[in-house]
From Swiss-Prot:
Species of the source: Methylorubrum populi (strain ATCC BAA-705 / NCIMB 13946 / BJ001)
Name of protein: DNA ligase
UniProt keyword Glycoprotein, yes or no: no
Residue ranges annotated for the BRCT domain, each copy included: 735-814
Enzyme class label: ligase
Cofactor(s) needed: Mg(2+); Mn(2+)
Length: 814
């Protein structure tokens, strides 16, 4: 595999740093997957997502023990939405490895030949077909009739969208032709043509509704409607290109499969070609790239597959992708235009997101008038790692900018043409208050780079309307308050009706206002459908009305059942940045209830470290360990007492030569360095702060996040209001009598009867520690299908390995 920037950067990481970066990348990828697959609202371009994925894979290549330890590492998509029934794929829907350069294609072909042990004279053919930018779909036919249609979901479990798929004209309800297998799962892509996409957006605009960002989002949103009538009103299309479970083999090459599909009435992309060398594959890639703008639908690359199915079976799979296939991505498309203004939108997590208003320009056949500017750091010419980007060039209103449309998704401003900058252009100043709620907007210290985060975030938290719905959805989620029945739709209804703006409002709900909000929402949807010429739902019958009343009473009952809740769940439900389930449990172990924790945080806030202390901690060659040893005592050490030195000079003298060099390079002179060291000595954090920050399960990053959250008066008031409605209980202590007390358990491979998070929670409840890697200290490895390197590690260390069924039997006895 060619050396990439990602693999080069990983080479310098220690094991601890790699684990931290792996976790950070996993969180970013899992969020991106959720937004892309479930919300149909991606925040990242394809290129940005691919860069995250490449770095994650580079870390796993160097540290194999991290492979499969997170959803991002093990999965290929996102967990299916709760809105649809779930369908488990008989054969997983995997993703593909990516190529970004011709050299990657050459290496792919060479790798296939090496694996198959082919001589130079032995041929191997590949199919090359356009990579459709739509929504992956699996169609299950039994006896030629469509019985189930499911989205990709997380690759293992998808969403049942059968009723909607049956409304798509390209998808036959019954296959035609002969020799159709008894069971046939057809895999393909649902998409919208450019013409149909423009028509949908025109209707959206006429109805005063939000426009879809691109055809992919529109196609995904249309297929994933709860009402099939809405799907039927949108002209979705479909291309078949692969298969899942089949009752019997029906041909022996990939190209023949596509011909059989065509004969059975399934649409197949006409630009698929059989190639016999890397040169032919790349030539077809270039030809499709040249035709791209005129195809009439979005594609973002070309997919190559080994044609011989026997070869495919021998090549098999590696991690989350087949060895016999590769996606060759297109480079971004560019145009130059003028930046007219910068607007600020507040994201679901409080991020202040700059949006470029552009003089309209055509990019890749699409007229673009808006583009993302990512974040404050990006506008200033600073990357997420704190290092300069674009050679430090900032972006200003009035600039001539280069706009890129990468992966046919979200356009972004890539660079600025300095030669055309107006003389009166001034640096853009980000607002320091949230435009949605007026709370302070801040840039936090990045725990990895020790530099200011590139993103400015609203501190309004629970009271910010821009974040409100998402915060409330998190609050009621399974790992939060776990309020049964309060799905996403109910939260949106209650928020829009003004009944629930913060968590405490949920516990003040009454039957009549709640019912009125639900009825009003239903009537509004009916009116909207009539205006669009769609069939409105029938009025609820008396029986339906009684069922609705019962459902509302059940909602209120679930609220009453949560008037007492464990402290760790309470904390996690608040959605405080950096406070995940593990940190929430650590806090709950140390404090009996929420008032005790808040009192301790008030003391910690008063004893926070000062700016000079933090600045010193971030210097190269210093770090927290050196800093703490340096300030262990301010009294003169032996050998210092005889010298008439200031405190700052004494402290500087305790540094190693390389550390002194770093300090002097930063502060400029010995006098400035000594003064800064003395200020840092007076700004050391107190014991109340270190109670949190020095705790290995909490740490300074989570501590600072807690302090910042509760220092915002709105958040403090919202939590106190919630505490008037509910009480917190101590975390149930794990006793030594617990079945797995003190044991370290590792899960590897695919668990088929419970999710990874369920397995982890069960083990922890029984006293075990769950680890992501196997060592001599591991007591038990639970292995499912697809287990890899961890099995070898277990054998090497003599660790007991059990199957998932064995594990469940052990649980039954616990």
């Amino acid at each position: 595999m060619p050396r990439t920037q990602a693999s080069a950067a990983v080479e310098s990481l220690s094991e601890d740093a790699a684990q931290a970066r792996h976790a950070e990348l996993s969180r970013a990828i899992e969020r991106a997957n959720h937004l892309y697959y479930n919300e149909d609202a991606p925040e990242l371009t394809d290129a940005e997502y691919d860069a995250l994925r490449q770095e994650l894979e580079a870390i796993e290549a160097r540290f194999p023990a991290l492979t499969g330890t997170t959803e991002a590492s093990a999965g290929v998509g996102a967990k299916p939405s709760e809105k649809f029934a779930k369908v488990r794929h008989a054969v997983p829907m995997l993703s593909l490895g990516n190529a970004f350069a011709d050299e990657d294609v050459d290496e792919f072909v060479a790798r296939v030949r090496r694996f198959l042990n082919l001589t130079a004279e032995e041929p191997v053919a590949f199919t090359a077909e356009p990579k459709i930018d739509g929504l992956s779909l699996s169609l299950r036919y039994e006896a030629g009739r469509l019985v189930t249609a499911a989205t990709r979901g997380d690759g293992e479990v998808g969403e049942n969208v059968t009723a909607n798929a049956l409304t798509v004209e390209d998808i036959p309800a019954t296959l035609s032709g002969k020799d159709i297998p008894e069971v046939l799962e057809v895999r393909g892509e649902v998409y919208l043509s450019h013409e149909d996409f423009a028509g949908i957006n025109a209707r959206q605009e006429a109805a005063g509704k939000p426009l879809f960002a691109n055809p992919r989002n529109a196609a995904a949103g249309s297929l994933r409607q709860l009402d099939p009538a809405i799907t039927a009103s949108r002209p979705l299309r479909f291309f078949a290109y692969a298969w899942g479970e089949v009752s019997e083999p029906f041909t022996d090459t990939q190209s023949a499969v596509l011909e059989r599909f065509r004969g059975w009435g399934l649409p197949v992309n006409p630009r698929t070609k059989l190639c016999r060398s890397a040169e032919e594959m790349i030539a077809h890639y270039r030809a499709i790239e040249a035709e791209r703008a005129g195809l009439g639908y979005d594609i973002d690359g070309v997919v190559y597959k080994v044609d011989d199915l026997g070869f495919q079976r021998r090549l098999g799979f590696v991690s989350r992708a087949p060895r016999w296939a590769l996606a060759h991505k297109f480079a971004a498309q560019e145009a130059i235009t003028e930046l007219l203004a910068i607007d600020i939108n507040v994201g679901r997590t409080g991020s202040l997101n700059p949006l470029a208003r552009l003089k309209p320009v055509t990019v890749g056949g699409v007229v673009v008038s808006n583009a993302t500017l990512h974040n404050e750091g990006y506008v200033q010419g600073v990357g997420a790692d704190g290092e300069p980007i674009r050679e430090g060039r900032d972006i200003r209103v009035g600039d001539t900018v280069i706009v890129v449309r990468a992966g046919d998704v979200i356009p972004k401003v890539m660079d600025v043409v300095l030669d055309k900058r107006p003389a009166d252009a001034v640096p853009y100043v980000f607002p320091e208050t949230c435009p949605a709620c007026g709370s302070r907007a801040v840039r936090e210290l990045n725990p990895r780079t020790k530099k200011l985060d590139a993103i400015r975030r609203c501190t309004g938290g629970l009271i910010c309307p821009a974040q409100g719905v998402e915060r409330l959805k998190h609050f009621v989620s399974r790992n939060g308050f776990d309020l049964e029945g309060f799905g996403q739709t109910y939260i949106e209804v209650l928020f829009e009706a003004g009944l629930v703006k913060q968590p405490a409002d949920l516990f003040r709900l009454e039957f009549e206002p709640l019912k009125a909000a639900i009825v009003a929402r239903r009537e509004a949807l009916s009116a909207q459908r009539r205006a669009e010429g769609e069939p409105a739902p029938k009025k609820p019958t008396k029986k339906k009305g009684e069922e609705e009343d019962k459902a509302i009473k059940n909602l209120l009952a679930s609220l009453e059942a949560r008037r007492k809740i464990a402290l760790n769940r309470f904390l996690f439900a608040l959605g405080i940045p950096q406070i995940g389930e593990s940190t929430a449990k650590a806090l709950a172990k140390r404090f009996p209830d929420m008032p005790a924790l808040m009192a301790a945080l008030e003391a910690a806030t008063r004893e926070q470290a000062g700016r000079d202390w933090l600045e010193l901690s971030a210097l190269p060659r210093i770090g927290p360990g050196t800093r703490d040893r340096l300030f262990e005592t301010l009294d003169p050490l032996p050998g210092e007492a005889m010298q008439d030195l200031s405190l700052g000079a004494r402290l500087r003298g305790r540094l190693t030569p390389s550390q002194r060099e770093a300090v002097l390079a930063h502060y400029g002179s010995e006098e400035e360095a000594d003064a800064a060291l003395e200020r840092a000595a007076s700004q050391r954090p107190g014991d109340a702060y270190r109670l949190f920050a020095d705790d290995g399960e909490i740490g300074p990053v989570a501590t600072d996040s807690l302090i910042q959250f509760f220092s915002e008066p709105h958040n403090d008031a919202a939590v106190r209001a919630l505490l008037e409605e509910v009480g917190t209980e101590p975390l149930a202590a794990t006793t030594s009598a617990a079945a797995f007390a003190g044991k370290t358990v590792v899960f590897t491979g695919t668990l088929e009867k419970m999710t990874r998070s369920e397995a982890k929670a069960t083990a922890e409840r029984l006293g075990a520690k769950v680890s992501g890697s196997v060592s001599a200290k591991t007591d038990l490895v639970v292995a499912g299908p697809g287990a890899g390197s961890k099995l070898k590690d277990a054998e090497r260390h003599g660790v007991k390995v059990v199957s998932e069924d064995d594990w469940l039997a052990m649980l039954a006895e616990a």
